[in-house]
């Protein structure tokens, strides 16, 4: 029984964040801490006497081991990518050598990390030249990831994570007796079977960005693409990573094939991507959509609310899944 006020998700006051964090970093005097973006996590822009920085306050459900993995990966990638055009966001090191701080929040403990502000502009990947360059950058990122060893525990971007866990969340939200559940179970089972069959052919497996749809990657300064937001990075199929680029929505429909061809040509100019891997792209585009449905459900109770996730939302996904004709 709750007898005291509780919060599911708070927005922390910038003044509180400055009080908690400014003493830990050698980034100059804080002149401004501005609430910048509400996403899965909260983002603030910091302006100091030394320049601009980005502060991420992770949602309460993100555990310390998850943040430690992400920031360790970024630190290692900075070294591995030093000789190529591709870059990643830079976590700022605290005076005592730590990369993050655990904060008290109304809903519980939340973790905060500060990153150097990215210069440049977002490339919308609307032309062949940009897509070819972005393909090269994605390949350089995967090549660097192949040279990295991560010792922290981490989930895998496998069929269990993408499909099985998503199905469990969706069914839990809808209820076992909902008329769409039997179809969703059958669809998920068929999708799992197809993924396992494709994987048995020997797909490229390694550390992935995990959210490579372009919005987290296409920040460009000259010839440099900078990749950021590695929250979903883990071991997985590289075809899944590239499927997110293939499924990018912010491109004209009649240009998508030409842009994809340019992207994959750029990727293959740096590292191999087999015919088997490319043949799995469409399958992983479907898997990504099923995972997105599960992600929607995961944030209804404490972020987005149920209003926009009713029967119309469900029917949209069901009709989309039926259109794939995998069952």
Descriptions of predicted regions:
Residues 37-49, 54-55, 91, 192-240:
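Active-site acidic catalytic loop and adjacent metal/ATP-binding pocket
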Residues 12-24, 146-151, 165-210:
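An alpha-helical support segment within catalytic cores of ATP-dependent transferases
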Residues 97, 108-125, 167-175, 290-307:
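A glycine-centered beta->alpha junction motif in the catalytic cores
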Residues 95, 124-182, 205, 308, ...:
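A cross-family kinase active-site recognition segment
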Residues 239-272, 287-304:
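Active-site activation/catalytic loop segments of kinase-like enzymes and analogous catalytic loops
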Residues 49-150:
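ATP-binding pocket architecture of kinase catalytic cores
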């Amino acid at each position: 029984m709750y007898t005291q006020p509780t919060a599911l998700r708070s927005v922390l006051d910038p003044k509180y964040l400055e009080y908690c964090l400014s003493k830990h970093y050698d980034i100059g005097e804080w002149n401004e801490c501005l609430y910048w973006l509400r996403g899965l996590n909260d983002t603030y822009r910091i302006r100091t006497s030394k320049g601009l920085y980005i502060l991420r306050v992770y949602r309460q459900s993100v555990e310390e081991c998850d943040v430690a993995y992400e920031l360790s990966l970024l630190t290692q990638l900075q070294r591995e990518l030093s000789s190529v055009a591709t870059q990643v966001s830079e976590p700022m090191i605290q005076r005592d050598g730590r990369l993050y701080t655990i904060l008290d929040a109304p809903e519980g403990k939340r973790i905060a990390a500060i990153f150097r502000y990215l210069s440049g502009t977002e490339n919308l990947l609307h032309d062949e030249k940009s897509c070819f360059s972005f393909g090269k950058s994605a390949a350089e990122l995967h090549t660097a990831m192949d040279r990295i060893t991560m010792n922290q525990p981490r989930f895998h971007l496998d069929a269990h994570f993408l499909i099985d866990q998503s199905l469990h969340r969706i069914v839990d939200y809808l209820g076992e007796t909902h008329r769409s559940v039997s179809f969703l179970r059958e669809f998920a089972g068929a999708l799992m079977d197809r993924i396992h069959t494709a994987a048995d052919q020997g797909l490229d497996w390694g550390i992935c960005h995990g959210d490579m749809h372009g919005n987290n990657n296409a920040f460009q300064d000259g010839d440099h693409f900078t990749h950021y937001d590695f929250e979903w990075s883990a071991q997985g199929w590289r075809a899944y990573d590239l499927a997110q680029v293939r499924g990018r929505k912010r491109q004209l429909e009649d240009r998508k094939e030409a842009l994809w061809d340019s992207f994959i040509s750029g990727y293959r100019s740096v590292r191999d991507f087999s015919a088997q891997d490319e043949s799995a792209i469409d399958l992983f585009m479907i898997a990504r959509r099923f995972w997105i449905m599960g992600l929607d459900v995961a944030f209804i109770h404490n972020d987005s609310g149920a209003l926009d996730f009713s029967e119309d939302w469900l029917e949209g996904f069901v009709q989309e899944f039926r259109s794939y004709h995998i069952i």
